[in-house]
Structure formats: structure tokens, C-alpha cells
Amino acid sequence: MKYVMVILGLLVLAAICCASEVEELDWRQEIARAILEAELQPEERDCKGLFRQCKKSSECCKGSSCESDLTGLCIFNLPGR
């Protein structure tokens, strides 16, 4: 009888552990999904971000400038330029 109770107790414990692992996995997937959704939505701003097409530096965000001669992309401001 004691062995049956021990086995039943272990089975219940195993079931609880499995259920908590499934909940933890769902929680991680929800966080990953939320991060991806936030990253994939376009930002609304008055300037163009890095590596976006531009024609003049005033179109690019602060800290970057348009390299229209070379690539036509907004890039980081380089020292000495």
C-alpha cells in the first residue's frame, strides 16, 4: 500500500512539473512574439534611419549623414568629414 501511494505521489509530481514546463514555454513564446511584432512594425519619424535611401543629409536622423556620392544611404557621421 505504501508503494502505491509513493508511486501515485511521484506521478502527480511529474504531472505538475510537466505542466509548469509547458506554461514556461508558452510564456517564452509570448515574449518572443511580442518582441518580433514590435521590431517588425515600421517606426514613424521625421528622419530616415541608418542605411535608408537618401538624397541629402537633412533627410537623415541626427548622428548620420547622406552619402549620396557613394551609396545614397544614411550612414554614421565619420570623424574628420
UniProtKB/Swiss-Prot annotation:
Family under the similarity heading: Belongs to the neurotoxin 10 (Hwtx-1) family.
Domain of life according to the entry: Eukaryota
Organism: Macrothele gigas
Domains: entry comment: The presence of a 'disulfide through disulfide knot' structurally defines this protein as a knottin.
Primary location: secreted
InterPro entries associated with the record: Huwentoxin-1
Keyword Hydrolase carried by entry: no
Propeptide: 20-45
Signal peptide: 1-19
Keywords: Amidation, Disulfide bond, Knottin, Secreted, Signal
Pfam families: Toxin_12 (PF07740)
A GO CC term assigned to this protein in UniProt: extracellular region
Subcellular location per the Swiss-Prot or TrEMBL entry: Secreted
GO molecular function: ion channel inhibitor activity
Residue numbers carrying Proline amide: P79
Summary of the function given for this chain in its UniProt record: No toxicity is observed upon intracranial injection into mice and intrathorax injection into crickets.
UniProt protein name: U9-hexatoxin-Mg1a
Organs and tissues of expression: Expressed by the venom gland.
Disulfide bond sites: C47-C61, C54-C66, C60-C74
